[in-house]
């Protein structure tokens, strides 16, 4: 189906994707990373078969990219013209309208198929050292069709990602995705981060158990990444923050 797969960005998500693909498919896995040392580490440790070069781009059937939002856009705009016609591209960025707005027409112009993607999995750590070949087991994989994709491409992607261990695939529009993710993911990080800003947080030892652990698990943010994600989805996130403030105010008044 996808004989050669390029994973761009070998951090937690990209590294886990590379490990999963290599372990569970017959695809040849190429890796690209902004820092050469990380790509060399991935080659030495086994998640990839080779480090991607411009010459190898023409051999790639599927690109999966796990960079920050603007870095993903910049990388794809630079490298789409190097890819063979008909290549399929899936990003793993946690916002979708921003991505589609910047990449849909460029994909059409380059003759490649761009599909927005978002694997609903992660850890409270970052980097290749924390990547796992089981990270996506049972998780949901969201696909956002674009004008450059087709039913055939989407069906192929759904089958391929299910073979990687995902529990289900979901299709939606970019707008639907961003509104739901503002609630299910981004708001949770905001609330968790705000919660531990209480002066009582430093005194929790001996007074905390499961509830505290659950609510604070995602409080430690990758500030650079999450700031960019929040700003790219500012309006839906602001609406969700307003909504929870309204409900908290109801509790306060009672």
Predicted regions and their residues:
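Residues at the starts of beta-strands that form the adenosine-phosphate
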Residues: 4, 28, 113, 140, ...
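Internal alpha-helical scaffold of NAD(P)-dependent oxidoreductase catalytic cores
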Residues: 133-218
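N-terminal Rossmann-like NAD(P) cofactor-binding module of classical short-chain dehydrogenase/reductase
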Residues: 63-64, 90
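Short beta->alpha hinge that forms the Motif I/post-I loop of the SAM-binding pocket
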Residues: 34, 67, 92
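Rossmann-like NAD(P)(H) cofactor-binding subdomain of soluble oxidoreductases
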Residues: 77-129
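Interdomain hinge/lid region at the active-site interface
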Residues: 203-254
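NAD(P)+-binding Rossmann beta1-loop-alpha1 motif at the extreme N-terminus of oxidoreductases
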Residues: 1-54, 58
């Amino acid at each position: 189906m996808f004989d050669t797969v390029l994973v761009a960005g070998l951090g937690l998500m990209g590294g886990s994707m590379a490990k999963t693909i290599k372990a569970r498919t017959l695809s040849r896995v190429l890796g690209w990373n902004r820092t050469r040392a990380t790509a060399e580490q991935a080659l030495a440790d086994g998640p990839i078969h080779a480090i991607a070069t411009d010459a190898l781009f023409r051999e790639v059937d599927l690109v999966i990219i796990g960079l920050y939002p603007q870095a993903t856009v910049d990388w794809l705009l630079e490298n789409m013209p190097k890819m063979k016609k008909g290549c399929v591209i899936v990003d793993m960025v946690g916002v979708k309208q921003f991505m589609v707005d910047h990449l849909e027409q460029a994909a059409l112009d380059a003759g490649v198929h761009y599909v927005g993607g978002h694997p609903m999995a992660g850890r409270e750590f970052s980097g290749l050292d924390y990547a796992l070949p089981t990270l996506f087991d049972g998780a949901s994989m969201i696909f956002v069709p674009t004008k450059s994709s087709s039913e055939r491409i989407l069906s192929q992607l759904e089958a391929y990602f299910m073979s990687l261990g995902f529990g289900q695939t979901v299709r939606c529009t970019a707008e639907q995705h961003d509104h739901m993710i503002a609630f299910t993911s981004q708001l949770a990080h905001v609330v968790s981060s705000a919660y531990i800003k209480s002066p009582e947080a430093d005194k929790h030892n001996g007074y905390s158990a499961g509830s505290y652990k659950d609510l604070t698990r995602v409080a430690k943010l990758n500030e650079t990444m999450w700031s960019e994600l929040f700003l790219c989805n500012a309006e839906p996130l602001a609406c969700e923050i307003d909504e929870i403030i309204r409900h908290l105010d109801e509790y306060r008044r009672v």
